[in-house]
Amino acid sequence: MRERLAAAGLAFYRGAVSPTLHALAPGGCRFQPTCSEYAAIAVAEWGLARGAVMAMWRLLRCHPLSRGGFDPVPLRPKPGGPHLRANGSNFEAKASRREPRSRDAR
C-alpha cells in the first residue's frame, strides 16, 4: 500500500512538477536514469524504506559540481551468491582467489 502511494506521488511529480522545473531551468538531468526514475526503480526493487534512502542519497549527489552520468539502481544480490560491498568490490571472492604471499616476496 505504501509503495503504491509512493509510486503515485512519483508519477505526479514526473507528470506535473518536473516539466515545470525543466521549463524554468532548462538543461535536463545530470544523471541517467533521472532522479525520479531512480526513486521509482529503487522503491520497486528494494521497498519503500531502503528505496527512499537510496533516492535521497541520489538527490544529495545531484549538484552543480557533480559530473552526473549513468548511475543505475544497485541490483539485489542473488540468494546464495557473493555479496557486493557498496563500492562494487567483492572482498570475499577476491580473497579466495589470492595466492598466499611468501615471506621472501616483499
Swiss-Prot record:
Listed name of the protein: Putative membrane protein insertion efficiency factor
Residue stretches of biased makeup (Basic and acidic residues): 94-106
UniProt-annotated location(s): Cell inner membrane
Key words of the record: Cell inner membrane, Cell membrane, Membrane
NCBIfam families: membrane protein insertion efficiency factor YidD
Species in which this protein is naturally found: Acidobacterium capsulatum (strain ATCC 51196 / DSM 11244 / BCRC 80197 / JCM 7670 / NBRC 15755 / NCIMB 13165 / 161)
Family of the protein in this entry: Belongs to the UPF0161 family.
Annotated transmembrane regions: none
GO cellular component: plasma membrane
